[in-house]
Amino acid sequence: MLRGVAGAAGLAAVSGGLLTACSSSDSSDKKSGGSGGTASVAGSTVTFGSNYSDPAAKTAFAALTTAATTSSKVKVTVNTVDHNTFQDNITSYLQGTPDDLFTWFAGYRMQYFAAQGLAQPLDDVWEKIGGNFGPAAKQLSTGLDGHQYLVPLYNYPWVVFYNKSEFAKRHYTVPTTWDEYVTLAKKMKTDGLIPIAFADKDGWPALGTFDILNMRINGYDYHMKLMSHKIPWTDAGVATVFQHWAELLPYTQSGANGRIWQDAAKTLEAKQAGMMFQGTNQVAAQYVTDKANLDDLDFFTFPTVNPKWGQDYMDAPTDGFMLSKKAKNTDAAKAILEYIGTGPAEAEYLKTDQWDVGLANGLQVPTYNAIQKKSVAEIGKCKAVAQFMDRDADPAMAKAMISIIQKFIDDPSTGNIASLQKSAEQQAKAIYTS
């Protein structure tokens, strides 16, 4: 995808009051150095609604906005909101009194709010920054009307994490097939480990497991058609996904629906768990936050299930920034975005961010660690990448699937799978025909 995908083909076809009450505000107004910034916007201030609420991500974002101020001479006031709260209240936030700029996601999630008239097009910004990105990055930033609405910053892969020292000590081998993966999980359980750390209290993490199983079993095209309801949720292919997942559940951390992913990651850090399937944006970031041994952390791409598709696909979500329709200082906000859409801006952000990878063409990031270098390589091997269910599907459908998957986790029986598929299809018909 994008810079991180290294030119792979077929990529990713790809309330306001509550937010204010829950937010913290930081101002970036450095005066020294930098170039750019016009007399018309210099000294003005823009507000930035941010869901970068985890400590490590918040620090990296502060570095980016400070650099943006230095370059553009525009002050930035950041209003940080808990990540999940931001997402849950985004519609009422944008309809109310939003900040000038806000953090958001590429693909369908961007297109949805653009189509609702809640964001301003950024074609003039892209005229200036377009040469910094490949066509796939631009595609992921383009609305259904053909206009650009997002300036991307980074992407990151969803992969299976493990501690190198633990694998070496116990003589474990990285699995490349489903059978090897299940066999390894059984061995870990026998050895007294939690084979796979797992959490879904927040609802969205388990969507990633559905995504990867669906792409491994049925392929990328099938997955994207399912996300747009061109394939019914009662299809046999969906049943196969849940059946494979049910085979794996005895080896995943119990009580997942009552646990947040941060706590699951801590069991991996403590070497109580052998593996964890999640994004680098979460697990590697948590290692940094907890000052755990990041050098010991490694990952492998999810093993092959159907040889027809191998390991050709993965979720590699792209995050970036949008301009709200109700922005009070549009010109200054665009000046900030013109800086953010550059290689030097991404490099500045990635000096602190030790888990994501940038998208700009020719990006040079001397600070990339082993996880980031491997992320670039593995995303680059993909024939296509998805954005994640809550970005590729209608938001209402993704929300419905959160509840359905949590019910599946509680009861993975064959009868319940069939019942949940029917429920998903009934809700999909209502959502996609409305």
Question: Predicted regions: what is each one?
Answer:
Residues 3-111, 116, 257, 292, ...:
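Conserved N-terminal structural module of periplasmic/extracytoplasmic solute-binding proteins
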Residues 51, 109-111, 243-329:
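Extracytoplasmic/periplasmic substrate-binding proteins
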Residues 99-100, 130-165, 194-197, 310-313, ...:
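A structural signal for short loop-to-beta-strand junctions that line the ligand-binding cleft
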Residues 107-158, 209-211, 298-299:
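Hinge/lid segment of periplasmic solute-binding proteins
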Residues 119, 124, 281-288, 319-395:
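Mature extracytoplasmic/periplasmic domains
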Residues 149-153, 158, 182-230:
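Extracytoplasmic/periplasmic solute-binding protein
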Residues 168, 381-434:
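Conserved C-terminal helix/tail region of periplasmic/extracytoplasmic solute-binding proteins
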Residues 187, 227-257:
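Glycine-centered hinge/linker elements that transmit conformational signals in sensory
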